[in-house]
Amino acid sequence: MTGRSIHGSTTDNRPETIEETAAGVTARGGKGIAVRCDHTDSTDVCRLFEGIKDQHGRIDLLVNSVFGGSESSLPRAGGRRFWERSEEHWDAMMVAGAHAYVLTARNAVPLMIPQQKGLIINITAQLDNTISANLYYDLAMNAVNRMTLVMEKELKEYNVSAVALCPGWMRTERVVDAGFGPEDGATETTAYVGRAVVALATDAHVASLSGRAIEVAELARTYGFTDVDGTRLFTH
């Protein structure tokens, strides 16, 4: 479990730490291991996977979930149109996004190829052939979808699959802080996308979905899982 702040130092003034996240994994029956890593820094990423190789010798599942476009340090958006928005928003979305995904995946794949098995899940926020109201965001998300398609082509011979997974409006800490909760009927818990990841990772035929951008809601129908409260949202 990587990517959040550690030992009380904060990322974007958020109080949550990677130790807390790892503890949550352990509490749910897994084994959470907190590792500090800046996924936009190639040295950090290389060091992370060197440690994984030394300790485990392989990696079976990689979930890329990084997005830098919401940081409070970014300038306030000047308007809705791309020429009214700061280029810093574009840089943040692409660097802490598609760039970080590629850096991480290119270090993970060599640990998947020897056993001829692996799954890369790239978290995205929109499906192919949809248009966002924000050009920078649209390009950032479609870059993730496109890289997933090309990954499928290059990884197929090694039996490694790549899927772009699109959750709905998740009830993250930011969303909860903004006043949204279960009563709104539109948000979903982070466990919902987690269950989608588990469904994909345990599907012996996941290669049939490789290269696609798929909504969590579609997978909920296919695999028959629900959110923790028993609901099953079907629209993004």
Task: Show which residues each predicted segment covers.
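C-terminal helical subdomain
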Residues: A164, P182-H236
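Conserved hydrophobic beta-strands of the Rossmann-like cofactor-binding core
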Residues: L62-V66
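Active-site loop of short-chain dehydrogenase/reductase
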Residues: G30-K31, R58-I59, M112-A125, E157-S161, ...
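Catalytic loop of short-chain dehydrogenase/reductase
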Residues: G68-S72, G79-H89, M93, V102, ...
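A short helix-coil junction within the Rossmann-fold of NAD(P)-dependent oxidoreductases
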Residues: Q55-H56, G69-L74, N107-L119
